[in-house]
Amino acid sequence: MPDSAQPLSERLDALEIRIAYQDETIETLNATITAQWQQIDALTRQIKAFHDRLQQAESNAPAAPANERPPHY
């Protein structure tokens, strides 16, 4: 291989290595984002379930008279 082609070959190798690392990083980030979205979805469902339970508990709670003084008065 001529001397003038050596730097080009080295540059090409460096670019290929760099792309390989970038591909690995992209895959890792994609997996992380996917896991985070799954966790967000699960937490959103959990919050909705808690909200529904709270609404149900509030609707089943006995209504307090509006003008009644608290017992400590």
Curated annotation (Swiss-Prot):
Q: Indicate, by first and last residue, each region the UniProt record lists as having compositional bias (Low complexity).
A: 57-67
Residue span of region Disordered:
54-73
* A Pfam family it matches: SlyX
User: InterPro entries in the record, alphabetically?
Assistant: SlyX
Q: Which domain of life is it from?
A: Bacteria
What PANTHER family does its record include? PROTEIN SLYX
The entry's family comment says: Belongs to the SlyX family.
Q: What is this protein called?
A: Protein SlyX homolog
Q: Name the gene that codes for it.
A: slyX
